[in-house]
């Protein structure tokens, strides 16, 4: 019986680790998607303002440039998105 219990506990631990990995990957992809949507909104706003006024908005262009600077990828550092 203890052998079966050990196998059951090991299976639960493996399932927990797999769940954590999957949800972490999903969270990272979600953050990338949110970031891309923000960039697309800024790009669209800059384009609309450029059409209306004939020149680009400086503040929006600077914000878009700041979003483009990601930096080095460090696995495990979730704030590096």
UniProtKB/Swiss-Prot annotation:
Give the activity regulation note.
Answer: Ion channel activity is inhibited by hexamethylene amiloride in vitro.
Organism superkingdom: Viruses
What is an example of a GO molecular function annotated in this UniProt entry? monoatomic cation channel activity
Listed transmembrane segments: 8-28
Coiled coil, from the record: none
Residue intervals on the Extracellular side: 1-7
Its record classes its membrane topology as: Single-pass type I membrane protein
| Modifications the protein undergoes after translation, according to the UniProt entry | Phosphorylated by host CK2. This phosphorylation is necessary for interaction with human BTRC and degradation of CD4.
Where does it mainly reside?
host cell
Could you tell me the keywords of this UniProt record? AIDS, Apoptosis, Host membrane, Host-virus interaction, Inhibition of host innate immune response by virus, Inhibition of host tetherin by virus, Ion channel, Ion transport, Membrane, Phosphoprotein, Transmembrane, Transmembrane helix, Transport, Viral immunoevasion
Q: One cellular component GO annotation, for this chain's record?
A: host cell membrane
Q: Copy the domain comment.
A: The N-terminus and transmembrane domains are required for self-oligomerization and proper virion budding, whereas the cytoplasmic domain is required for CD4 degradation. The cytoplasmic domain is composed of 2 amphipathic alpha helix that form a U-shape.
Q: What's the family?
A: Belongs to the HIV-1 VPU protein family.
What does this chain do? Enhances virion budding by targeting host CD4 and Tetherin/BST2 to proteasome degradation. Degradation of CD4 prevents any unwanted premature interactions between viral Env and its host receptor CD4 in the endoplasmic reticulum. Degradation of antiretroviral protein Tetherin/BST2 is important for virion budding, as BST2 tethers new viral particles to the host cell membrane. Mechanistically, Vpu bridges either CD4 or BST2 to BTRC, a substrate recognition subunit of the Skp1/Cullin/F-box protein E3 ubiquitin ligase, induces their ubiquitination and subsequent proteasomal degradation.
- List the protein's name: Protein Vpu
């Amino acid at each position: 019986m203890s052998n079966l219990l050990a196998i059951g506990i090991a299976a639960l631990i493996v399932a927990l680790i797999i769940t954590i990995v999957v949800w972490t990957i999903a969270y990272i992809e979600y953050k990338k998607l949110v970031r891309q949507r923000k960039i697309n909104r800024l790009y669209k706003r800059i384009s609309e303002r450029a059409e209306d006024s004939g020149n680009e908005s400086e503040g929006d262009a600077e914000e878009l440039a700041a979003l483009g600077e990601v930096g080095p990828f460090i696995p495990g550092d979730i704030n590096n998105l």
